[in-house]
Amino acid sequence: MHQTSGSILSPSDVNNLVGIKPTVGLTSRYLVIPISEHQDTVGPMARSVKDAAYLLQAIAGVDPNDNYTLAIPNNGSIPDYVAACDYSALAGKRIGVAWNVIDIYGPIDEPVMTAFMESVALIERAGATIVDANFTAFPEYVQDNNETLVLNADFLTNLATYLSELSYNPNNVTDLQDVRDFTHNFTAEDWPDRDTAVWDDALDNQGWNNTDPRFWAAYQANLYYGGEGGILGALDRENVSAVLLPTQLSPGIPALVGSPVITVPMGFYPADWNVTYNRRNTLVETGPKVPFGLSFMGRKFDEATLIGLAYAYEQRTMHRNDVQPYIIPNIELGDFVK
């Protein structure tokens, strides 16, 4: 799965899955339809931490077609992520909680907060020391627009590069303007009911890409909000191995600096919870037995540590099994790849 700012973590959160959003550069994005070279990453969604570790082991590594992968430490050597699945991984660790993110984003639904507090207590009982690890610049970040500027600017450049590499392009679309024109004129795209507001903002309101001098200031602001004032600063300042948040709150800050996150099932809404829908009234957002997850956020290229911590939590809780799915696939991938 491809994530820019939530597309691994968010669906994993509400589908009772483990999801690993890797460090930007740990896995290749070559020929993945891009949004942002600074935030895009490819990672696994799976039923267990160990399954996700196996998948990450298979897809991580240097690719000459994606120069971001040249940043992988130790000359591109990949750790043994499966071996990192250690029941005792929480023992002796310092684990942070970004309480100010919860306070600022709040109020959080009571079932999620109750499960989160129980998870923090369980992690402490497993031998970890729990400390406050706030994101000091988070109050400024939530009022800031630089992330949108960076994503728009990257998208204008990166999409054109991707389209130029296609060997088959029957409609001769070469940039975002062409893609928007095609979308507006192709009936099956259901425009304007399904709008192109994000593209319109990039093209009509912003109008500059990541080669523009204005890009650098916006990008540096992002690095501050995600770095010293965000997850990286919290990790170093409090000397912790990971920072915890409910997964619904975790994607944004690590995305700014390309740092890794793993989400693990943490619980479910109760059976009598009222159904709430998205703004189009077409998808359930919360409701009876809808799952939610716990995120472990860490340092760049330190996925092995996060996998160990997540595995130790998962094996003590096994929340995935608390509710049985309505539909269970009767075909396994292994049936075809053996």
Residue ranges: model-predicted function:
Residues 89-100, 150-226, 273-294:
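Short helix-loop capping/hinge segments that flank enzyme active sites or metal/cofactor-binding pockets
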Residues 255-258:
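Alpha-helix C-terminal capping segments
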Residues 2-99, 117, 121-122, 161-168, ...:
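Structural helix-boundary/capping segments
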Residues 108-136, 158-169, 220-237:
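Acyltransferase
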